[in-house]
Amino acid sequence: MTDTPTTGTTGEKAPESGAISDFGIDTTSKSAGEALREYWAKVRGGDFGSLPALLGLFVLVIFFSAQSETFLTLGNISNLLAQGAGIVIIAMGLVFVLLLGEIDLSAGTASGVAASVMALHLVKSGNMLSAFGDGVFYITCAFMVIAAVLSGLLRIWPGVVLPVVGLVIILIGVPPNAWVEMLLALCIGTSIGSLTGYLVAKVGIPSFVVTLALFLAWGGVVLKYIGQGGTLPIRNDKVLFNVANGNLSILNSWILFLLAAGGYAAVVLGRHFARLRKGLVAQPTPLVLIKVGVVVVLSAAATFLLTQNRAVNPTVTILGVPYVVPIVLVLLTLGTFVLDRTSYGRHIYAVGGNAEAARRAGINVAQIRMSVFVIASSVAALGAIVYSSKVGSVAPDSGGGNTLLFAVGAAVIGGTSLFGGKGRLRDAVIGGAVIAIISNGLGLLKQEAAVVSIVTGLVLLLAASVDALSRRRSAAS
């Protein structure tokens, strides 16, 4: 990298030289035309980002709106948000794994294990010895101890603390409480991620093999915990049930809008004008203002619509933004901050781009690799809470079936590369919206489950093809 051109002893400006990417000469503001041409050049070079998913989302909304009068009703929009939230959350965790070019096929059944332990603690009033039986109880406790030790070996401290907290909850029989149940689910998810990550990062088993084996194993654990044909209800706990079925008040809905839209505008505009003050290249101010304005207007419109009564029964009132919206927004904000604004996030991208170069740069590759699996399983546990809340119970097949495939599909469809090093957390949200709309729209058209799976599979195949072609074009350019 060349230094910024400075004034010599004669007072004359030094000639500009160096590569186009040198920060020293990267100090002019782009015009709108230049910004658009640069973006088009990136697209032609194979860097599509989330553009295909956004275009697909637009086409799907238009198509299903034309085919079904129910699709754009307030009740269906609210239901769509609640239906897709669980998959979106699990997909967010998987983005961290995919950024390293790895895969976690066990995230779905891992979420099922977390949900089943949460429900057992609630149903059995905290008496986990009675819930599990002697053998399973002690095996579960030993597993959590091992998970904490494995995380400690690589100094992943959340992976140490949370399993220990979960172990304490189980051993002393903490009385049932919705917040305790959710914390316990998170602890179980973290424990599972610690084992998965260690086997991949330190033992050296390929992630596909490890997570495929654990996908089967955790499915068996859920069946063992709940029993064949059994079901654990959680709808009687108001807090747990309202996670995916409750709504904010009208006042709190608008407060959420002000915080979310205002925070987004402040961050985007703050970064933009900071770059201008430092003389760095920035997008044209009008384009930035348009982008912020579109987000704010759409958010305000969505908030207004969701604060209207959407109940079909005239004797019932249902209004307010669903609780799942702030849950997803908080996770999206935290995850985006971690990936974009911390050294840990930069290390993830570095390892995903070139693990050997990252190792030579002093990055603890094994620690990074293990940590993303801890994150994926922990976030999958949060997704399990939302999904279980939506259906009101935990069944032996929880986390199985299409849960994992839809979550991976959401991340990939949204624009996260299967080859590592490229992706954003928002990809999971965009891709999750595509999958949720396909499932919801085809359901409204009374299509059978087979059609939903076929269409979703074809969309995922198309997204993976775009990713592969994008990578090939980028390598050729």
PLM regions and their residue ranges:
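Single transmembrane alpha-helix segments in multi-pass membrane proteins
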Residues: 61-67, 72-125, 143-156, 198-208, ...
